[in-house]
């Protein structure tokens, strides 16, 4: 304690405030008028006594620290403060020297009982008549017993409760106090909006089972504890929280999370062990920073009824009125009555369930019980008071769940001002911010009566995660409602897309505003300087022969020009050509120079492009052998230089990871017998994956190199179950690529084959004779069981990785693909199944992998969308305009509506056109001046009717259209064969099969023709075959 320094200036300033209110009592301090002294005593620490009391708050307010077992006695005239405490505390308090007319007396309480009693009797003897105290705080301890005994022994003393006057003194905050409370409020709102909301949505969306208490603990850990520090990734989302002292931060109480029909709106409520459930979810949390408290409470509505949305909107209106009424001079009871009367006018049912108070004053004491915003409190509000405003209704009957009730709550920390209250914990109050729609509820709401008149929703777009399950609902609309529902969905998509495109343009202009007029807003190309030889003496002796000399060590070519040896670095040479003439050979060396039509993606920068350049130089010689040798040497040197530069650029983004820290004191969690892809040595190697302190490690069984992946470098973590696959996968997508062997990779996955490949070699006759054999049925059951066990094993391990990463303050969540939203396409060279996840579009079943992060996508353009074509293409333009767009070709047109609906639900801007565009030319134009591009309309040109300008390919189709017919007709994948008979399928519904189906003879003839065509084309798998079929299919 010797390093503790008390702030004397703050103590005397605030003590003077107490004496000033005491000497000139009025209003709330009127009770001090006849009092000669005030005794404030803090007893021994006790868990049973509330931690937030006026005694503790007063000590912290004056001294900055809590001093247990300490008595403070204020005497009015002359102004004097007497402290009675132990010797160690007395040394600290003696730092306060008398100042500003306030005398300080420090009495040391002896450990001897008799001496301690005499000291206390001496202090009590100085008291006369009435003295103020805080009896409701109920302190305990030896010091308290000695004090009570001494007071009782003096019969002429009368105790007066001064809770209200002390509350009034503490209520009005100065500038430093307000600054601290605002920081506390920012901490609370940041953890509520940026962590709890998204975490809760993720749990509900995925159907994860997690108790209220467990979720509250996750929230509480974000502030840090003794084992680990604060989650800076979360707090850095609010720039104003970058440099605060988290050691001075703590939760006022463990966050209170309630759902499932059990709600308690009292201050004493706590989270229970029930699992978080959809419906109405209440969340309350408060953070204390440098002893000042703040609080925030929100209601989240999961698939609410129209009535619940209306009720919540009503509460928002009442909240707005309450904020206007909470101003300097207003009486607390009048505010409550006005708000209650307003609610009664709007909705009498809600008024009957309205809470008995609107909140309370807060500060160093979390809840000032002497200042409640209720109908009985006639105290006036003062400027710069800070309140917790709570608008809530309790125990409303739930129409959807008979016998159950629900509650609605909005709670904020507010500051009183001249013209109303200012909300310090603003955010996440609008209906669109708190509503999350689930699939089941939307299915129930699809009724003929409603569908006849499309629902108009003027609220902004729902959060992205709220629509994961709702993207395919239109395919489930039955009968006469199908067309109407599809039309309604199209209208919603159109409205949302107009908003997204407007926002995209506005953000683009703002993003590139600082670079207006500049070129591409990126770093200018650096001119590289090469120095072959610093001094003439370094030239090789061979140049004395005045012949062309290739110096491989210096990466230079020395040319004899006018009798001088002139060296040229290989980077300045573009290429070399040779021409044979009868008995001569001409060697022509072409140099790099500006203005050439090189057809390269990057032009070589020059210091002065306007200078005079030598384009080429020619040498003619009869020594053909020497000239050929020089030609080959220059060519080889150029190839080596180009290769080195290519490798350098390719490895420029590869990072050197930090060292993996292995867990100590226990064995790491292990997933055994898995295969990595790509392999560490380019070969298939099995081994184990281990979870360590700051990352995961693949430890091979053989001599191959181990693979370390740090949590800090993991961008996405995917788990793909074995459904319709032969393997189960844990896939890691990295932020920056790493080296595996001699190749770089941004994706590493660990998989295990579901079962060894087995073949039934039984003849056809025997198979028909034993159809339904019990052995085969048992084998299928075992296979399903084995798949389920393997899926659970990998999923649990992925969850362990997520937990370990979150323990190291990394925001990492396991993402599982939605197979029902999947579609086929060609991201590379073959048709594969592409599966959406919560945040990405992926293909990870086989190499090469495809992982597209939707948050990094600027716009998605759909190409070749026109009547008569079976396929369309999709182009992802990334926010990093320097990166080339990602193409996915040959997507069956049957998936067009679902793809649009999925992208729209993820708030991704979409455009479409009838032809393929020349994207290299488009991106070159965009990068030349991004600000001008966005200022002139940005990507709006894509949303027009489209034209043939910039078209690279004709309307017949993209590279893989020739293969797609064969794929559609003869592919034997599980996905295609099953989807043809699904009742929900867009391409072949039950109605279409019954109304327009062909007979078996016709189907058999078509299958025979397809087989013959398949054999003729040799399967149609290679690129060459595909091109041949494409060419032959044109008419």
From Swiss-Prot:
Regions of compositional bias (Acidic residues) in chain numbering: 949-985, 993-1002
One Gene Ontology MF term: histone binding
Disulfide topology: none
One CC-aspect GO term: FACT complex
Region of interest (Disordered), ranges: 440-471, 944-1035
Cellular compartment(s): Nucleus; Chromosome
SMART domains reported in the protein's UniProt record: FACT-Spt16_Nlob, Rtt106, SPT16
Stretches of the chain forming a coiled coil according to its record: 637-657
Entry's Gene Ontology BP terms: constitutive heterochromatin formation; DNA repair; DNA-templated DNA replication; nucleosome assembly; positive regulation of RNA polymerase II transcription preinitiation complex assembly; regulation of sister chromatid cohesion; transcription elongation by RNA polymerase II
Subunit structure: Forms a stable heterodimer with POB3. The SPT16-POB3 dimer weakly associates with multiple molecules of NHP6 to form the FACT complex.
Function statement: Component of the FACT complex, a general chromatin factor that acts to reorganize nucleosomes. The FACT complex is involved in multiple processes that require DNA as a template such as mRNA elongation, DNA replication and DNA repair. During transcription elongation the FACT complex acts as a histone chaperone that both destabilizes and restores nucleosomal structure.
Record-linked PANTHER family: CDC68 RELATED, FACT COMPLEX SUBUNIT SPT16
Stated family: Belongs to the peptidase M24 family. SPT16 subfamily.
Listed name of the protein: FACT complex subunit SPT16
Protein's organism: Cryptococcus neoformans var. neoformans serotype D (strain B-3501A) (Filobasidiella neoformans)
